[in-house]
Amino acid sequence: MKNTDTREVIMISIRLSTKNLQADYYPFILEPEARHLFLKELASHFTARTDLLDIQQHLDEILLTLDGQTESYTFALTLPRLISITLDTCNACGKNQQWFRSLSACIAMDAGLSRPIRLFISDTIPPIIQWTGLHADRVSTLTQEMAAGNSPSCLITHALYKRLSPSIQSKYATLYYIRHICCYCAEL
């Protein structure tokens, strides 16, 4: 892997959580189905986009890696609204199938330089991709803390904040420090 593969990226973590709507209902088998449905619906928002570099799901977390071109920042900031629409669709589907669960999500976004490291195992298994830098770790840490109810459900790091235009920065005026990570959220 050459150092020339280093590029500006936007790393986004979406951490899903479920809430029981009925006290005596324990649908352990349905949570993977709900996550699959969410991921399928989310992927539909990216079909016409060329800036999605990678998407990975790890149980209740989805990591998106977008190319850090200027228009990707604008799109990334619309993701909370798109995720809300996706959650509404999934929850309506779950209600129709009597899952008695509701999905919610926490979203964290970071930006910076990164490059993909590919691990090839065999010809039949797609390569495993890891991204250099701390961006995936930071957004994952943030959404883990957010899922515990310690902050708003959508945060951007200072690294992403400083790449935004002043007019957009003014919308993200509330400052948070979570695990020594400087973050902002939109005014409520």
Where are these regions (language model features)?
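Amphipathic alpha-helical regulatory segments at dimerization interfaces
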Residues: 41-45, 82, 89, 93-96, ...
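Short, conserved acidic/polar surface loops in the N-terminal third of protein domains
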Residues: 23-25, 117-122, 167
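Short glycine-aspartate micro-motif
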Residues: 11-13, 104-108, 155
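Catalytic NTP-binding/metal-coordinating core of nucleotidyl cyclase/transferase enzymes
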Residues: 2-75
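Short amphipathic alpha-helices in soluble, non-transmembrane regions
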Residues: 76-83
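Catalytic/regulatory signature loops of cyclic-dinucleotide turnover enzymes
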Residues: 111, 122, 132-162
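Catalytic core of nucleotidyl cyclases, primarily class III adenylyl/guanylyl cyclases
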Residues: 50-72, 90-132
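Intrinsically disordered, glycine/charged-rich C-terminal tails and inter-domain linkers
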Residues: 1, 146-188
